[in-house]
Each structure stands twice: as C-alpha cells, then as structure tokens.
C-alpha cells in the first residue's frame, strides 16, 4: 500500500487552499495577500524560551479584551483566525453528520477546514448585491451547526447589512452558532457586531492581528464569544497554541501606543484605497466595487490578460473567483501609484486596439459594400 493510499480518502481528494504565498510569483510589488505595507518594529526578549508558553497568556487575553470592549472570559487566542475556524468545527460538528453553511463568494478556508474533518458543507450564494439571502439560508438550516459570515467580506469588500445579521441570529437561536469573520473589521470598527454578544449567546466573532495590525507573519488570532462557547473551545485547543515571542509582540501591538499607531496606519491605508478607487474608476470598462477593508475588488473587460501582464511586470495581484475580477490589496502610496499607472496604460492600450480593430472592420465592410454595388 502506497503512502498516498494510507491517507484518509477525504485528504486524498482535498484541494488545498490556494493562498497567495502558495501561488507564488516574483516581483517588487506584492498586492495579493491583503497584507499591511507597514513593517513595524518590536522588542523581543529570549529569557523565557526554555519554558512552555501559557495556553492562554493572561496579558494578551486582557489586552485584546480591552481593545474589543468585552470581558476577558469572552476571548480565546489562537494561531491566527484560521485556527479559530478549525476549533469551532472540531468542537461543534460531528463528522459525516453535521454541516456548516457559508455564502460564496467568500473566504475559502471555511469549506476546506470542514472537508478536512469530514464535515458536510452547504452553500447559499450571496445576493447580486452581495448581501445575505436570508430566506434561502433559513431553508437550508437543517443539520447545520455553524453559519459562517465574512464581514467585511473577502473578496468582495462589502459589509453585511447589520439588520440581516440580527435576523440571521434570530432564526438560528437554539439551532446553530453564527460565526462572523471580522478579519478586516479594524478598517471599519463602526460596523462590528461585538456589541451583539450581550444579546445572542450563539454569536461567535473571529478577529486577527494579520491585517490592520500589520502582523500577518506573527499568526495571532482571536475568537470572541460567550463563556459557554469559550470553555468548550478550551477543551479542544492545543496546550501551547501561542509562542512566547508571539504573545509578547501582540501585547505590544495592543498597547495604547500600539493601537494609536495602528489607527494612524489604517487612516493611511484608507486614503490609499480611496486614491486607487478614484483612479481606477475613471478608466473605461472598469468597475470598482466599494471596499471597507484593505483591498478592492475590480472588474475589467479583459481581466486575465491584465493579470498576466501585471504578473510579468512584477506586480502581483490576486485573481478572484468572480468572473473578470481582480482583487487588489492596498499597499503604500508608491505601490498604488505604480500599479494604477500600469493598469491605466494597459487598459488604454487595450481600448485603442479595440478601436483600431473596429475601424478596420468598418472600413472592410464599407469596401465590401462598394465592391458589391460596383
């Protein structure tokens, strides 16, 4: 029996998540992983590396609880929000029996995490406006333990209607947990659902330091929920999920000074997002969708050709599962200017080529008519 045959059937058939790093590429401008353009410095001490870390470092838990405005007993930290997704699935779903529900187009790890653990998946596509299709969700709740909603949504960038989220919470009471993925919420904190934790015991919120806090390489995420949920997750989580240096750096990032710096950087990124949106929106045949995170979803007439041209030029963006769309992470101003300039030149060139082709076609047609009349 081969090594491949020894693996679980589910794993053999699994298509792994195509992360930006896994897809690769080489260039000077990387705007494909929704990373922050800021590389902040932190102090790291090595005096405790001979000791295991706490399962849930008290200083880190308290620091994030203070930031989120909730009780420390409502916070669990993990290796990124992705581990939070897995913990929820492993804790609440029975393999080959229960299901999760999610609403594409959205983050791909919900499905992959479920499939890895032999959990069924149900999909209810977003509406044409990329909002929740509540009637269809309600019709598909049988056997569902977890409903995942990403807001701001990746890759579309929009925020889910708050009233719809409350209706979803009402319809899932005593049936399923609703998991709101707020990975990008620090760019629009006013839209957070964290205040709803006090009303809905089955609400769970996922957070991360990877985006606005510019710590993607740290792998530090948080699950916010009521204590009944947190206590169950603590039964499943690994004994030492957060390394000592990770906790130390995260606490610094969540300090008063760290939060002030993040707020300033969010304003800078938001300004660059507006710059990109305005510039791209002026181009013919280009549709820029409103974004609330650190990225924009943009529709082009010839998206594949543009993506390849950018890639070959060393500007690495992210292809979207949405037809003719590319997702562009918001970088620093220099990166945004160079990306916009290349796209503008390419789109203009494509437009001129189309016009030339149309002129030649019309000219040929006119000549044919003249010849026919002669």
Curated annotation (Swiss-Prot):
What segment(s) does the record annotate as region Disordered? 351-374
- Entries under InterPro entries matching the protein: Aminotrans_II_pyridoxalP_BS (IPR001917), Aminotransferase_I/II_large (IPR004839), HisP_aminotrans (IPR005861), PyrdxlP-dep_Trfase (IPR015424), PyrdxlP-dep_Trfase_major (IPR015421), PyrdxlP-dep_Trfase_small (IPR015422)
State the source organism's domain of life.
Answer: Bacteria
Q: Write down the chemical reaction(s) this protein catalyses.
A: L-histidinol phosphate + 2-oxoglutarate = 3-(imidazol-4-yl)-2-oxopropyl phosphate + L-glutamate
**CDD domains associated with the record:** AAT_like (cd00609)
Q: Which GO terms describe its molecular function?
A: histidinol-phosphate transaminase activity; pyridoxal phosphate binding
Asked whether the UniProt record includes Amino-acid biosynthesis among its keywords, one would answer yes
| Oligomeric form and interacting partners | Homodimer.
NCBIfam families reported for this sequence: hisC
Recorded family membership: Belongs to the class-II pyridoxal-phosphate-dependent aminotransferase family. Histidinol-phosphate aminotransferase subfamily.
Write down the HAMAP family for this protein, in alphabetical order: HisC_aminotrans_2
Q: Which protein are we looking at?
A: Histidinol-phosphate aminotransferase
**Native organism:** Photobacterium profundum (strain SS9)
């Amino acid at each position: 029996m081969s090594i491949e045959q020894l693996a679980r059937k589910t794993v053999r058939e699994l298509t792994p998540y195509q992360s930006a790093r896994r897809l690769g590429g080489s260039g000077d401008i990387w705007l494909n992983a929704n990373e922050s353009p800021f590389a902040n410095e932190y102090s790291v001490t090595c005096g405790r590396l001979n000791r295991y870390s706490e399962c849930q470092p008290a200083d880190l838990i308290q620091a994030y609880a203070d930031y989120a405005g909730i009780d420390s007993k409502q916070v669990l930290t993990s290796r990124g929000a992705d581990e939070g997704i897995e913990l929820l699935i492993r804790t609440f779903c029975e393999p080959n029996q229960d299901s999760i529900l999610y609403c594409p187009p959205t983050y791909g790890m919900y499905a992959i995490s479920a499939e890895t653990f032999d959990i069924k998946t149900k999909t209810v596509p977003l509406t044409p406006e990329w909002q929740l299709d509540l009637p269809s969700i309600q019709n598909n709740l049988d056997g569902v333990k977890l409903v995942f909603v990403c807001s701001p949504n990746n890759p579309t960038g929009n925020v889910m209607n708050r009233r719809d989220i409350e209706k979803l919470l009402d319809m899932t009471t005593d049936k399923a947990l609703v998991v709101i993925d707020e990975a990008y919420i620090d760019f629009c904190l006013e839209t957070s659902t964290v205040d709803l934790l006090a009303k809905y015991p089955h609400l769970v919120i996922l957070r991360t330091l990877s985006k606005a806090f510019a710590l993607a390489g740290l792998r530090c995420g948080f699950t916010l929920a009521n204590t009944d949920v947190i206590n169950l997750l603590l039964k499943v989580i690994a004994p030492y999920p957060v390394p000592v240096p990770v906790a130390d750096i995260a606490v610094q990032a969540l300090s008063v000074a760290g939060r002030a710096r993040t707020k300033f950087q969010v304003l800078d990124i938001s300004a660059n997002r507006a710059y990109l949106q305005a510039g791209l929106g002026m181009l013919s045949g280009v549709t820029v969708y409103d974004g609330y995170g650190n990225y924009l979803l943009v529709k082009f007439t010839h998206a594949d050709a543009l993506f390849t041209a950018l890639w070959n030029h060393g500007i690495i963006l992210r292809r979207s599962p949405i037809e003719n769309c590319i997702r562009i992470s918001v970088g620093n101003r220099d990166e945004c200017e160079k990306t916009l300039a290349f796209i503008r030149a390419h789109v203009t060139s494509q437009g001129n080529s189309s016009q030339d082709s149309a002129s030649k076609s019309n000219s040929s047609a006119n000549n044919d008519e003249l010849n026919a009349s002669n």
